[in-house]
A protein has these predicted regions:
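Metal-dependent nuclease catalytic cores that hydrolyze phosphodiester bonds in DNA/RNA
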Residues: 1-109, 229, 393-395
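A residue-level signal for conserved active-site and pocket-lining positions in enzyme catalytic cores
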Residues: 15, 103, 133, 215, ...
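Short helix/loop capping segments that flank catalytic or ligand/cofactor-binding pockets
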Residues: 21, 223-226, 261-264, 331
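Conserved DEDDh/DEDDy metal-dependent 3′-5′ exonuclease domain
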Residues: 84-90, 94, 98-102, 113-116, ...
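Conserved RNase H-like, two-metal-ion catalytic cores of nucleic-acid enzymes
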Residues: 92, 239-314, 338
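Acidic, Mg2+-coordinating catalytic module of metal-dependent nucleases/exonucleases
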Residues: 160-227, 373-425
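Helix-hairpin-helix
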Residues: 226-242
């Protein structure tokens, strides 16, 4: 039975208290956010695609945690089986530490270890991940020719069928891993000792609570900190009104659903190319709301249909209010949507307006999202995470995809509530 894994080791490096709580008080964890779930799904999808780069492998994924020990034995047997050339999710254990290696490939009389990442670059955390895996592999006496990180090539442009040889790039981290081995051995011994203690280590809250990842025990450790979120928001109204202009202009509220797939879907696209896969337009012509919705979730190749529809539907308004983390004008210009000067000047990203007007509240310090702003302005209300829409949009379940229209409308109505409240309409 193992004591540590790759994830718990990395957790210990970030905060020893988090490691202790995870192993001894897991029920204190925060609920997994929709954003985290979306990231996990993206990583899993890229990992499965990476396996096709090395076809014909054996999947060693355990069916349950109780099967880890069995899979460790099977993995080691496969290393000496000449008929086995590739394994996926191979399971190794050394020094009470268990790892599951994304891909391991026979390389002559040795093996090449590969860790897959869905990012466009390599971070220090990824390097440490690989160094730990190297430590366990060497401890298991696996003859290694190299250990590499396999990640997305930012310069790849799709032209026809997906070219995995061009989509992925490799970087050896063997030299780095070898230099880190003594540190890892000491850390593992230290972490195992911490886990055995009767009480969690006394560690004050600080930057480690959010770096490099937001800690899943954030709510527990911060529960006694005075709740600044109870204080009302502040804003520079003079700047706000200058940016808004005439409050009585005819206004439409636009909620755009962008998709940035790690793997390009269409010819001419690069990894993480952004395009519109759905939108909701909300307006009020007198007494009743007017709502127009569109999406192409059943066929993403139809995404360009959104552009003329948006141009047509927004043409009759003096102003279009949206809320987006990206530069919305630049994004729409890429789709040739804003070639018309008549439409270009109408688009107003209310997120940028609030930031320029120094909108301040405890909730938006680390997350200037629509949800955080809404709950700052209306402290007695809540709004779901936007990542819920992303997850449902990418779901294979038609019922979950059908929820998108309603959620886009709800976000749009929340934006209108914020707008009217803040500018006192």
């Amino acid at each position: 039975m193992h004591i540590l894994s790759k994830s718990t080791y990395i957790k210990g490096e970030q905060c020893e208290k988090a490691l202790y709580l995870f192993k001894n008080r897991p029920f204190l964890r925060d609920k997994l956010s929709m954003e985290q779930r979306a990231k996990f799904k993206r990583g899993t999808d890229v990992g499965i695609l990476a396996q096709q780069y090395f076809p014909g492998g054996i999947n060693m994924t355990p069916s349950s945690p109780s099967q880890f020990s069995k899979k460790v034995v099977e993995t080691l047997k496969n290393l000496t089986n000449p008929a086995v050339n590739v394994m996926y999710e191979a399971v190794f254990q050394y020094d009470d530490t268990l790892i599951m290696l994304d891909i391991i490939v026979r390389d002559g009389d040795k093996w090449r270890a590969i860790e897959v990442k869905s990012s466009l670059s390599i971070s220090p955390t990824y390097m440490k991940d690989a160094a730990l895996q190297y430590y366990v592999l060497k401890g298991c006496e696996v003859p290694l020719s190299d250990i590499q990180l396999m990640y997305i090539n930012a310069d790849y442009v799709r032209n026809g069928e997906l070219d995995l040889k061009q989509l992925f790039v490799f970087q050896s981290v063997k030299d780095y891993a070898e230099q880190y081995q003594d540190v890892i051995a000491k850390n593992i011994a230290h972490f195992k000792d911490i886990i055995k203690q009767p009480h969690s280590p006394k560690i004050a809250i600080g930057s480690q609570c959010d770096t490099p990842y937001r800690c899943e025990f954030h709510g527990h450790c911060w529960k006694d900190v005075p709740n600044e979120a109870d204080k009302p928001y502040t804003i520079d109204y003079k700047t706000l009104y200058q940016l808004i202009g005439d409050k009585n202009q005819s206004t439409a509220f636009l909620n755009l659903l962008f998709y940035r797939p790690a793997v390009p879907l269409f010819d001419g696209d690069k990894p993480y190319t952004e395009f519109v896969i759905g939108f909701s337009i909300l307006s009020n012509n007198g007494q009743y709301d007017s709502i127009y919705d569109w999406n192409c979730l059943d066929d993403l190749s139809r995404w360009k249909e959104s552009l003329p529809l948006l141009t047509e539907r927004l043409a009759g308004f003096d102003r279009v209010i949206c809320f987006a983390s990206q530069n919305i004008t630049a994004s729409l210009q890429r789709f040739n949507l804003l070639n018309s000067k008549e439409l270009n000047y109408k688009i107003l990203n209310f997120r940028e307006v609030l930031q320029q007007a120094d909108f301040h509240h405890e909730k938006v310090k680390t997350d200037f999202s629509l949800k955080s702003v809404y709950e700052s302005v209306f402290p007695d209300k809540t709004l779901f995470e936007h990542s819920r829409i992303i997850l449902n949009a990418l779901s294979d379940n038609p019922m979950e995809r059908s929820l998108i229209t309603g959620d886009l409308e709800l976000e749009n109505k929340a934006l209108r509530e914020i707008f009217k409240k803040v500018i006192n309409i």
